[in-house]
Curated annotation (Swiss-Prot):
List of catalytic residues: C83 (nucleophile), H178, E180
Domain Glutamine amidotransferase type-1: 6-204
EC number per UniProt: 6.3.5.2
Origin superkingdom: Bacteria
Keywords: ATP-binding, Glutamine amidotransferase, GMP biosynthesis, Ligase, Nucleotide-binding, Purine biosynthesis
SUPFAM superfamilies per record: Adenine nucleotide alpha hydrolases-like, Class I glutamine amidotransferase-like, GMP synthetase C-terminal dimerisation domain
Pathway stated in the Swiss-Prot or TrEMBL entry: Purine metabolism; GMP biosynthesis; GMP from XMP (L-Gln route): step 1/1
PANTHER family registered for this protein in UniProt: GMP SYNTHASE [GLUTAMINE-HYDROLYZING] (PTHR11922:SF2), GMP SYNTHASE-RELATED (PTHR11922)
Cellular component annotations (GO), alphabetically ordered: cytosol
Pfam families: GATase (PF00117), GMP_synt_C (PF00958), NAD_synthase (PF02540)
Catalytic activity: XMP + L-glutamine + ATP + H2O = GMP + L-glutamate + AMP + diphosphate + 2 H(+)
Protein name: GMP synthase [glutamine-hydrolyzing]
Subunit structure, as described in the record: Homodimer.
Length: 522
């Protein structure tokens, strides 16, 4: 097995921490995110080639705020602190931090000193006096006001005189700005230099090698045992299934549960791709009557999610019991899920929506867990899917909620509503593809509204249902903006839906961003 050198990212609670990891991975190097208070023993055993301290919402100027484990500064490896990470490094190494008189949030211009090391020859332009200037993104209320012993200033501006600092001998670097965000144009170059030139990592994190490595790892871990996987047709479970099948072939059995709440022709597409084209063993269970029966009369979104999740567990457990030698349960867990689960153990957060996942399966199954995608971000999962030979349309399909159309039908779920919605949704997606807008949007779907409106078709009055169309663009799904689809495209979609889907006579377009709205309606 290939042993990659790796970067350790310690998370102090920044909204940008995952972006740091994305930038490191994009530079063809491996990294992992762990909480700032991870044990010194773990850090020593992890044996990082370099460490990045993330930003965070706390203030170093206050007592009882997070600090980096002291071992970080004793391992002899390069350390890069970003925003809060820079501040705690400076404070822990003998400098001081204070609340800034002038806070900086947004664009800033820095003057770069011509020091050897991290920022050498990295700049956006020079001014008339040949001073090198760097455009960056700031987001801070505190600043380092006294350098720790051994440090020098790398970059500054009038508002933040110590905007970037360095101890070249120990290879410790701090930046008050955020190199990981796209608003810092030279950010990728800065991270690339830290990872490869300063920490010495090779450019050895690539998908073909990772695929070969994971196939070997799965074979070694599973041995002769049988594996079962709940196949949803979504990107994550599909790529997990293809990867595991590449490794162990017929030892994998997938269970595909049709809950009656899938998209148009989805069951047939999944079976065609996996069973007939890839040769994966798939058990197709039509449980639509069970699911729809238990949803009768239920209007609360959370209650619907719980029922759908519970029914899935019962159906999956029933099918799993029929597979005699199954010892492993495979899941399409990806790295953001792992990070968020770890963060949930130490951070309080309000539940906006519960998430339906195979992870809710009961321990009575007595199966060991196999999560071959748990080291990958979503874009890496898609890249792996293409490397495995999955169809482009499947790999780049928009996200689909675990409860399916159950949370895109407002209020009570009925078979009639599901039929109307899946046909309207299919027209919407088909027209987006035809117009070249599908891949310009991050998620697009139709929502069924259980209200009727008056309409006129021909010479007659109609009184039929309403659907809403939703299309958003986003980098991370934490925030999103509504997609400004051309009016002519919206008109064509609306015309087709009201003419081709009998029972719908009105189409509206959702122009709400996130926040304040969520992407899904329920």
């Amino acid at each position: 097995m290939v042993m990659h050198q790796k970067i350790l990212i310690l998370d102090f609670g920044s909204q940008y921490t995952q972006l740091i990891a994305r930038r490191v991975r994009e530079s063809n190097a491996y990294c992992e995110i762990h909480p700032f208070d991870i044990s010194s023993q773990f850090i020593g055993n992890f044996a990082p080639a370099g460490i990045i301290l993330s930003g965070g919402p706390a203030s170093v100027a206050e007592n009882e705020t997070p600090r980096a484990p002291q071992i970080v500064f004793e391992l002899g490896v390069p350390v890069m602190g970003i925003c809060y990470g820079m501040q705690t490094m400076a404070a822990q190494l003998g400098g001081s931090v204070e609340n800034s008189k002038v806070r900086e949030f947004g664009y800033a211009e820095l003057q770069v000193k011509n020091l050897a090391g991290l920022l050498q020859d990295i700049h956006d332009r020079t001014d008339a006096s040949r001073q090198k200037l760097l455009d960056v993104w700031m987001s801070h209320g505190d600043s380092v006001n006294t350098l720790p012993p051994g440090f020098q200033v790398m970059a500054s501006n009038p508002a933040t005189p110590l905007a970037a600092i360095a101890d070249g001998a120990r290879r410790f670097y701090g930046m008050q700005f955020h190199p990981e965000v796209t608003h810092t144009p030279q950010g990728k170059a800065i991270i690339d230099r830290f990872v490869h030139e300063i920490c010495g990592l090779a450019y050895d994190w690539n998908m073909p090698d990772y695929l070969e490595e994971m196939v070997g790892r799965i074979r070694s871990e599973v041995g002769p045992d049988e594996v079962i996987l709940g196949l949803s047709g979504g990107v994550d479970s599909s790529v997990a299934a293809a990867l595991i099948h590449r490794a162990i072939g017929k030892q994998l059995t997938c269970v595909f549960v049709d809950n009656g709440l899938l998209r148009l022709n989805e069951a047939e597409q999944v079976m065609d791709t996996f069973s007939r084209n890839l040769g994966v063993k798939v058990i197709h269970v039509d449980a639509s009557e069970e699911f729809l029966g238990h949803l009768q009369g239920i209007t609360d979104p959370e209650a619907k999610r719980r029922i759908i999740g519970r029914e899935f567990v019962e159906v999956f457990q029933r099918e799993a019991a029929k597979i005699a030698n199954a010892r492993w349960l495979a899941q399409g867990t990806i790295y953001p899920d792992v990070i968020e689960s770890a963060g949930a153990k130490t951070k309080k957060a309000n539940t906006i929506k519960s998430h339906h996942n195979v992870g809710g399966l009961p321990e009575t199954l007595h199966l060991k867990l196999l999560e071959p995608l748990r080291e990958l971000f979503k874009d890496e999962v898609r890249e792996l899917g293409l490397t495995l030979g999955l169809p482009h349309d499947m790999v780049f399909r928009h996200p689909f909620p675990g409860p399916g159309l159950g949370v895109r039908i407002l209020g009570e779920v009925k078979r009639e509503y599901a039929e109307l919605l899946r046909r309207a949704d299919a027209i919407f997606i088909e027209e987006l593809r035809n117009a070249g807008w599908y891949e310009k949007t991050s998620q697009a779907f139709a929502v069924f509204l259980p209200v009727k409106s008056v309409g006129v078709m021909g010479d007659g009055r109609t009184y039929d249902f309403v659907v809403a169309l939703r299309a958003v663009q986003t980098e991370d799904f934490m925030t999103a903006r509504w997609a400004e689809l051309p009016y002519a495209l919206l008109a064509r979609i609306s015309s087709r839906i009201v003419n081709e889907v009998r029972g719908i006579n009105r189409v509206v377009y959702d122009i709400s961003g996130k926040p304040p709205a969520t992407i899904e309606w329920e």
